[in-house]
Amino acid sequence: MTITKTRAYIAGICSIIVTVGVARFSYSLLIPIMQKGAGLTELESGWLATSNFMGYMCGVFIAANMHNLNHKYNLHRLYLILSVVTSAAMVITSNIYLWALLRFIAGTCAAGGFIIASGLILKWLVNNNHRAELGIHFAGAGISIVVTSLLVQSMLATNSNWQQQWMALAILAAIIAIPAWLWMPHPTAHGQIKVTKKDNPPSKTFKLLMMLAYFCTGYGYAVSSTFIVDIVERVEGLKVQGSIAFLLVGLAATPAALIWDRVARRTGFIKALIAAYTLLAIGIILPAISDTLLVIIISTLLFGGTFIACVSLVLTMAGNFYPSNPARFMGTMTLAYSAAQIIAPIPSGYLLEYFGNYNMALYLSAFIVMLCTWFLFGLLKCSK
């Protein structure tokens, strides 16, 4: 089958919807529903999120250390299958340990959309003389949030329980996985030409600062993405509106990577990232300052408009250092991101139980994200 630029991007977007939207983001949407219908506690919800992030880190570790591109291609296909299976399997048990195992496997699958698929598409773009940007691909993150939010919201209108929600998400993933399976470009086929760009690895100091900045990003992302629905649900007058807030995040995230690609063309990657991180920190801290509807809307739009931009810009920059095998350094970078995601939900869960709200968790998260800018200014000095 001939792979065109359009088909490659569609495959990438569909891959993200399946492996990230359903296997990862949907859990955030279903936390309040599972707390009410399945007896999931606040602390357990944090531990399940951590299990999901641990799985993601495992998937990233595999991607970073797997050098055979053909194996990566086949692994991506396996992740598509497992994303469907783990979602459907959530309905057959209410055992917290089995849920943790399923969330771990689903997290591993999420690495397929963010790392392996990104690397395969970036390599195909470079090898076929297209612009080496992943903004369109990462628009899939926003689209995945929109699609899953609309599905959950529509099923809430019909009083569907948490089991029906998970099964509907599994069916959705199975359908959308088809173009991701058929059109993802194979690394040694589909008309790819010989790589003309040589690897241009950065210095060790540059790598270290980049990883520290991305670690801080992962912490901020983990707290908001996991608990944003529950944060909104706790606001008086916004009950049962959490999935709508998540929908706003998705709507903001869909064009964000494309917009920030254009910003980066004018300012460079690092200056664009400094701006994105600053706005991300503001978006994270706003709900702790005020819980009015307007502030919540601004917060969700800022978070949606920046979190995926940070991922897209960092991974594109990392991939461009190693055009022969982009996913390798992408994976190394994302290990730092994933480590923070594993850590973040646990203190957030304890802070929630101690204070009775998310305010302290959000203050801590915003502070850690602002540390990113300090590391990025260090990167500016390294790049001069």
Where are these regions (language model features)?
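Helix-to-loop junctions at the C-terminal end of transmembrane segments
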Residues: 59-71, 256-268, 352-353
